[in-house]
């Protein structure tokens, strides 16, 4: 797997050192690419000790190479893009380019994506009922007379 991005992205997150903590994992492109491939998503649960210790993720992360691509560096900091190329054992090659990261100024989350992210981040701490209640209060904040429950 080859991930090409802007220079600062390579310097900040392109280290081949395998993460040992959730914080290190969040700043490791090889880890995040591998975890997304293995688990089919990249959510908060991929940044746990259990996921970091997953041998399938570790093995795949060792095969991720992060490189600078001049056209992404030229667009940075206005655009935070990258492209990924995956070469499969059967010879198939898959590529995908993203001009702007999901959730960025130029590629904002949809309303549904923002709600899903909120639930993913809050449910482990708040539980489903409190999380839904809090999200509803936030979505209707202009109608609240006070914010004590938030």
Question: Where are the language model's segments positioned?
Answer:
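Terminal-appendage/accessory-domain detector
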Residues: 2-150
């Amino acid at each position: 797997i080859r991930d090409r991005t802007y220079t600062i992205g390579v310097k900040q997150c392109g280290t081949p050192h395998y993460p040992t903590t959730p914080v290190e994992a969040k700043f490791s492109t090889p880890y995040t690419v591998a975890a997304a491939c293995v688990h089919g998503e990249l959510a908060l649960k991929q940044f746990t000790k259990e996921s970091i210790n997953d041998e399938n993720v570790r093995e795949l992360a060792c095969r991720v190479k992060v490189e600078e691509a001049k056209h992404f560096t030229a667009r940075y900091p206005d655009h935070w893009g990258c492209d990924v190329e995956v070469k499969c054992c059967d010879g198939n090659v898959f590529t995908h380019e993203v001009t702007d990261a999901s959730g960025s100024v130029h590629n904002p989350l949809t309303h549904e994506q923002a709600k899903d992210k909120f639930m993913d981040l809050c449910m482990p701490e708040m539980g489903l009922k409190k999380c839904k209640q809090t999200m509803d209060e936030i979505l209707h904040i202009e109608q609240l007379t006070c914010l004590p429950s938030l």
